UniProtKB/Swiss-Prot annotation:
Residue stretches in coiled coil: none
EC number assigned by the record: 3.1.26.5
Gene Ontology terms, MF aspect: 3'-tRNA processing endoribonuclease activity; ribonuclease P activity; tRNA binding
Subunit annotation: Consists of a catalytic RNA component (M1 or rnpB) and a protein subunit.
Keywords on record: Endonuclease, Hydrolase, Nuclease, RNA-binding, tRNA processing
InterPro entries, per the entry: Ribosomal_Su5_D2-typ_SF, Ribsml_uS5_D2-typ_fold_subgr, RNase_P, RNase_P_CS
Catalysis: reaction(s): Endonucleolytic cleavage of RNA, removing 5'-extranucleotides from tRNA precursor
Database matches in Pfam families: Ribonuclease_P
PANTHER family assigned to the protein according to its UniProt record, in alphabetical order: RIBONUCLEASE P PROTEIN COMPONENT (PTHR33992:SF1)
Protein's gene: rnpA
Protein's job: RNaseP catalyzes the removal of the 5'-leader sequence from pre-tRNA to produce the mature 5'-terminus. It can also cleave other RNA substrates such as 4.5S RNA. The protein component plays an auxiliary but essential role in vivo by binding to the 5'-leader sequence and broadening the substrate specificity of the ribozyme.
UniProt-recorded name of the protein: Ribonuclease P protein component
Domain of life of the source: Bacteria
A single cellular component GO annotation: ribonuclease P complex
Length: 118
């Protein structure tokens, strides 16, 4: 089971249009299940897009750390047996305070939303 990233603006816009948005305190999550044919032909089941703006933190090192944390969270959640067979795409947009909150709380919040809506 592997995860591939959304590559270009067109893919991000498509998922934003087709997906359902969830606003949490530390992040915004967009999940799309009914994927168009460009995604269905792919060998991957999970597509991930991460948007970390400069407003969140000016330092690139911190923004990259946030992206690594998000990728790791998604790997943990998607490794669940229920999600390994489902094709879906998601975009995660972290908010202020994301880098300070502990990992287990983020894991709980994200998995709660993903498992409920997949």
């Amino acid at each position: 089971m592997s995860i591939t990233s959304l590559k270009n603006q067109k893919e991000f816009e498509l998922i934003n249009k087709l997906g359902k948005k969830f606003h949490e305190r530390y992040f915004i999550l967009v999940i799309a299940r009914n994927l168009p044919t460009i995604f269905l032909k792919s060998q991957y089941n999970t597509f991930l897009g991460i948007k970390v703006s400069r407003k969140l933190n000016k330092k690139a090192v911190i923004r990259n750390k946030i992206k690594r944390r998000i990728r790791h969270l998604v790997r943990i959640i998607v490794s669940d047996a229920k999600l390994s067979a489902v094709k879906f795409a998601m975009i995660i947009i972290p908010r202020k305070g994301f880098e300070e909150i502990n990992f287990s709380h983020l894991n709980y919040e994200l998995s709660k939303i993903v498992l409920r809506n997949i």
